[in-house]
Regions:
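Polyanionic, low-complexity intrinsically disordered segments
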Residues: 2-31, 133-136, 151-214
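Short, Lys/Arg-rich flexible segments
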Residues: 25-38, 42-45
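Short, functional N-terminal and low-complexity linear motifs
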Residues: 35, 83, 112-114, 163-170
Length: 214
């Protein structure tokens, strides 16, 4: 089990890799790249964009769990501030057992579960209640992940509802990749970059908790 600093370093590196993958995919398709007689087409680009997003979401999920356990073990944030905890595990394995209880695992893709556990284990939920400040983006990202992971009517409907709520209409045959490459209304930032910046914001906020107020 690494430190909070280790978790931040690893997560930031993976965010940059995901962004690089998407940028390179777009560059290849716009340049009509070929290799061994195979032309790099939009379909290939879309697959890489979607893989880049999945990598981003997996990075966030892993980071949330790692930092949660670090604070359970009494580690202070990068800014030197401590999080007052209600548990005192002896090591990371013990922390995982306390955290999971009778469950096989804790769903670190669920904002409500994370914040509920945080309020049970830390004073005022520690820094994890920051997730409520980015609730829409967090829920969006999970719905997009579900669309990529599950072939179901529910995941498709949730994705289409997300698209409508974000850009006010549903493009014909909209895909996850095409949505992620769409700019936010009246902005020059794509949804992929927006969600990446949200992820980076979460990484920094959780690693730098506020001074605890009893």
């Amino acid at each position: 089990m690494g430190t909070i600093n280790d978790a931040v370093t690893e997560a930031m590196a993976k965010c940059n890799l995901a962004l690089g993958l998407v940028a390179e995919a777009n560059a290849l398709v716009s340049g009509n790249a070929t290799g061994n007689g195979i032309v790099f087409i939009q379909h290939h680009c879309d697959l890489l964009i979607e893989r880049g997003f999945m990598s981003l979401f997996e990075t966030l999920e892993s980071y949330l769990e790692s930092v949660f356990i670090c604070y359970m073990l009494g580690e202070v944030g990068i800014n030197g501030n401590a999080v007052i905890r209600y548990v005192n595990p002896i090591n990371s394995e013990h922390a995982e057992k306390i955290l999971c209880g009778k469950e096989k695992y804790i769903d670190f893709t669920s904002r409500s579960i994370i914040t509920t556990y945080a309020e049970n284990f830390f004073l005022h939920g520690g820094p994890f209640l920051y997730l409520n400040n980015v609730s829409q983006d967090f829920e969006d990202m999970k719905k997009i992940r579900n669309k990529l992971s599950h072939i179901s009517i529910k995941s498709q409907r949730e994705f289409e509802s997300l698209v409508r709520s974000r850009i006010s209409y549903l493009p014909t045959n909209v895909s996850v990749a095409s949505f992620l490459m769409t700019n936010l209304p009246r902005q020059t930032e794509s949804f992929f970059v927006h969600y990446m910046n949200t992820t980076i914001g979460i990484i920094n906020a959780l690693a730098n908790p506020a001074v605890p107020v009893p």
